[in-house]
Amino acid sequence: MKKTIGLILILASFGSHARTEIATKNFPVSTTISKSFFAPEPRIQPSFGENVGKEGALLFSVNLTVPENVSQVTVYPVYDEDYGLGRLVNTADASQSIIYQIVDEKGKKMLKDHGAEVTPNQQITFKALNYTSGEKKISPGIYNDQVMVGYYVN
């Protein structure tokens, strides 16, 4: 009978949330909480110019809005990121291609590790310029490549 009564007392104790505090101590907490970063999708606009075969001609532009907390942005071709050169390849005939470079609004060539100084919420445009020397006849068609957009914070 004593065992049953003891069990009933313990359950009654838990049911009423009664507890006895033995001791308390403060412990410092240090943690880093970082904000998730979602890169905005750039808008890529092709050039419909007549002179795309000329050296320095605009092939396409990359427009984007700079996210919060970003101090530098770069856009560079995946094809040869070390030299900042891209290669647009005709989807119908892979032997036809255009070598290009990307520059910022001031004409500075963009590379993987070198970006343009920016401020948050700024609209910025990068230009892909024909890097082929002289003038080359460009066949009409769809030309593909890939570019990377890099965001940097200080």
Swiss-Prot record:
Keywords: Fimbrium, Signal. It comes from Escherichia coli. Fimbriae (also called pili), polar filaments radiating from the surface of the bacterium to a length of 0.5-1.5 micrometers and numbering 100-300 per cell, enable bacteria to colonize the epithelium of specific host organs. This is CS6 fimbrial subunit A. InterPro entries: CssA/B, Fimbrial_Assembly_Comp. GO terms for cellular component: pilus. It comes from the Bacteria. Residues 1-18 form the signal peptide. It is found in: Fimbrium.
